[in-house]
A protein has these predicted regions:
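Structural detector for internal amphipathic alpha-helices that build alpha-solenoid repeat scaffolds
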Residues: 35-49, 69-95, 106-110, 115-130, ...
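Positively charged n-region of N-terminal signal peptides that target proteins for export
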Residues: 1-5
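A short glycine-/small-residue-rich loop at the edge of a beta-strand within enzyme catalytic domains
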Residues: 298
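Bacterial N-terminal signal peptides
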Residues: 7-16
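Predominantly the C-terminal beta-signal and adjacent terminal strand-loop region
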Residues: 370-376
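Amphipathic alpha-helical scaffolding segments comprising HEAT/armadillo-like alpha-solenoid repeats
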Residues: 20-28, 49-66, 90-108, 129-145, ...
Length: 390
């Protein structure tokens, strides 16, 4: 009997502690009507915001079927969604984050109110929490919605959120929208979301490049460089893929128009600037193509010099034999006193070989001093010879 009495006393004591620890905002939420509950959530402090946001979301879900399209219930749902603090979400385990995301998806689905939907979308994006179900639901919505009739605010929030949480499927949906006339008024928002997602769609982008024409490759290249300029690895991978495709196009057509040359130079320049030696094989192959294009007057002198000087950045070892061989070829041309070669090209070859300093360039550089080149060229050759490492 005494034992039961002690348990009862302790029970009341613990209950008293619980109620005494409840904040005024929580008590107001429990006692209040919908408007008062919403006011309590909006007045939340650091001590009670987690509890109040959870109570508001749970209450909205539990009573939606009963209260239907009640505006005050929607307002409570919005206040609960917006109140979820970042620190709370950051401290959750993966399973707990999934549970929270599922609750948000439930709110999104059961409430017709656009304000609730927008609040859910913005919060999911801000907290960066999502499940495969949420991504799939958003993908499904954006793939079938009519941009002419859909609520603009909801659509914009959906694009913004998808850009943060989407996947390769999301990118494909948005890329398809970019081609449609009815989506042109959302073009900027659509492209911004695609820009955030394109890294996740690397495989798909490379597949498009590998079968694309010059115009299609140009669009992808420009898009990636514009939207992912700080992601050097991704930009390099796409640039190498584009350069490789331009080589294939040239080899199968035998001619290079201005559009192809421009794309070659731009993609090569990215690899050069990033010193992307992983593309050594591709850039060496491009040098051979550039020689053919230059000698057939398809590539101008300025671009060809850029290729000569840039190849040392992507293929510092492999390029020596290529550059030396080409310089030797020009030297042979000079054996005929009536022949002439491009002095800027010869100077680019000499300077680049000197900068690399590989002793295997000795013979071709020394030969320059024997031919009828200008004093400037001969002086440059002697300077480069002095830089060779033995």
């Amino acid at each position: 009997m005494k034992k039961n009495a002690l348990i009862l006393i302790l029970s009341f004591f613990c209950t008293g502690i619980i109620f005494s620890e409840a904040t005024e905002n929580i008590r107001n939420f429990v006692k209040g009507n919908l408007a008062e509950k919403t006011a309590a959530v909006k007045s939340a402090t650091k001590e009670d915001v987690e509890e109040l946001s959870k109570r508001a979301v749970d209450f909205a879900i539990e009573n939606k079927e009963i209260l239907g399209k009640d505006r005050e219930l929607a307002a409570l749902a919005v206040s609960g969604i917006l109140a979820v603090p970042q620190t709370y979400a950051d401290g959750l385990s993966e399973d707990e984050k999934n549970t929270l995301s599922e609750e948000f998806l439930n709110l999104y689905n059961i409430f017709e109110d656009e304000t609730v939907k927008i609040a859910v979308l913005n919060k999911i994006s801000k907290l960066n929490i999502s499940t495969e179900k949420f991504k799939a639901a958003l993908n499904e919505y954006l793939s079938h919605c009519n941009p002419e009739t859909e609520n603009r605010a909801v659509l914009l929030a959906s694009l913004h959120t998808l850009g943060n949480i989407g996947d390769a499927d999301s990118f494909r949906i948005l890329m398809d929208h970019a081609k449609k006339t009815e989506w042109q008024k959302y073009l900027n928002e659509n492209e911004k979301a695609m820009g955030l997602l394109c890294v996740k769609a690397e495989k798909e982008l490379i597949e498009i490049i590998e079968r694309g024409n010059v115009s299609e490759c140009r669009k992808i290249f420009d898009f990636v460089i514009r939207n992912q300029k700080d992601n050097q690895i991704f930009c390099a991978k796409i640039s190498e893929s584009v350069l490789s495709r331009t080589i294939y196009i040239y080899e199968n057509s035998g001619s290079a128009g201005e559009e192809l040359i421009s794309l070659q130079i731009d993609s090569f320049s990215v690899l050069k600037d990033l010193k992307w030696t992983r593309a050594s094989g591709t850039t060496i192959s491009f040098f051979d193509i550039a020689v053919r294009e230059f000698e057939s007057s398809q590539m101008n002198e300025k671009y060809f010099c850029l290729v000569i000087e840039g190849i040392a950045e992507t293929s510092p070892i492999e390029c020596v034999s290529k550059l030396s061989s080409y310089l030797s070829k020009l030297n042979k041309t000079m054996e005929d006193e009536k022949s002439s070669v491009s002095e800027p090209v010869v100077l680019s070859l000499i300077k680049t070989l000197g900068a690399i300093g590989d002793k295997n360039a000795f013979d071709s550089l020394l030969a320059v001093t024997y031919y009828n080149y200008s004093d400037t060229v001969i002086a440059e050759a002697r300077e480069s010879l002095a830089k060779l490492k033995w």
